[in-house]
From Swiss-Prot:
It comes from the Eukaryota. Signal peptide: none annotated. SUPFAM superfamilies: Family A G protein-coupled receptor-like. The lineage of its organism: Eukaryota, Metazoa, Chordata, Craniata, Vertebrata. It is a multi-pass membrane protein. GO terms for molecular function: G protein-coupled receptor activity; olfactory receptor activity. Residues 47-54, 121-133, 218-237, 293-318 are cytoplasmic. This is Olfactory receptor 5G25. It holds the Pfam family 7tm_4.
Length: 318
């Protein structure tokens, strides 16, 4: 015990995903493709929105920031995870662990409130169409983007500071593939109940607050859509929200499973599997959800490809 108290942890080791070499190959190739698709999809969405003037409206302003957050959150985790797959000692420094958690937490919380901002935007567009340009001014849109980043920063600073000022003087093997809060706290040489309660309370408050904004917005949207007489009008109105609802359901369901349910319900190993979904898969899915189910994005893609094709054809002729 004396040796445990005198040892200060300067680095952590990850257990990783699997020790089977054949599975490692499969996982590496799978998540390399997922990561490349994430970067291609999200950066492509940002470039498309920037280049196509018809997409210079609030809805796509928020979507470009969502794509930026997805690309960043995936880049915080995936490169390190991929480089560790074939390595026996999956090591990260104490400071590196704190930075990884800090950045990832920032982007996850920001994404939750960006989705809330997008829900409010859809509410105004469908329920108050005549006042849309007045309400969703450039100033309001900027505020609805700065707000999520600010809330994410505050939440992250609280959790990172409270977790990494604890003494770590014993085991330094994290049962995970990245520095998530609960696996790190399990290694602390102090009582972590306060930290776990803080995580549960803040995750609950932030989740409920952003969730209420989304829920109330969609209740009003649903009421308005049901008042539309034509079936075609109802279908068009709902189609503008379906992509957003899909993204919200996937993200909130996964985060609730990890952070809000009682910690004793499932093991850290199950958390690890679920974490793969929201660290790697969700950032990849969002741009495809919004592009495949959105006519304006598909039309913008077609216009971009046609423009590029025409330019290349002109160059060949000239």
């Amino acid at each position: 015990m004396m040796h445990r108290n005198q040892t200060v942890v300067t680095e952590f080791f990850f257990t990783g995903l699997t020790s089977s070499f054949h599975l490692q190959i499969v996982l590496f190739l799978t998540f390399l493709c997922v990561y490349l698709a994430t970067l291609l999809g999200n950066l492509g969405m940002i470039i498309l929105i920037h280049q196509d003037t018809r997409l210079h409206i609030p809805m796509y302003f928020f979507l470009s920031h969502l794509s930026f957050v997805d690309a960043c959150s995936s880049s915080v985790i995936s490169p390190k995870m991929l480089s560790d797959i074939f390595v026996d000692k999956k090591v990260i420094s104490f400071l590196g662990c704190a930075i990884q958690f800090c950045l990832f937490s920032q982007f996850v919380v920001t994404e939750c409130f960006l989705l809330a901002s997008m829900a409010y935007d859809r509410y105004v567009a469908i329920c108050k169409p005549l006042l849309y340009t007045l309400i969703m001014s450039q100033r309001v849109c900027v505020q609805l983007v700065i707000g999520p980043y600010s809330i994410g920063l505050i939440s992250t600073v609280v959790h990172t500071t409270s977790a990494f000022i604890l003494p770590y003087c014993g085991p330094n093997l994290i049962n995970h593939f990245f520095c998530d809060l609960l696996p790190v706290l399990s290694l602390a040489c102090a009582d972590t109940q306060m930290n776990k309660h803080l995580l549960f309370i803040m995750a609950g408050i932030l989740g409920v607050f952003s969730g209420i904004i989304i829920l109330v917005s969609y209740v009003y949207i649903a009421i308005t859509i049901l008042k539309i007489n034509s079936a075609d009008g109802r279908r068009k109105a709902f189609s503008t929200c379906s992509s957003h609802l899909t993204a919200v359901s996937i993200l909130y369901g996964t985060l609730f499973f990890i952070y809000v349910r009682p910690s004793s319900s499932f093991s850290l190993d199950i958390n690890k599997v679920v974490s793969l979904f929201y660290t790697a898969v969700i950032p990849m899915l969002n741009p495809f959800i919004y592009s495949l189910r959105n006519k304006e994005v598909k039309d913008a893609l077609i216009r971009t490809f046609e423009k590029k094709f025409c330019y290349s054809l002109q160059d060949k002729i000239l």
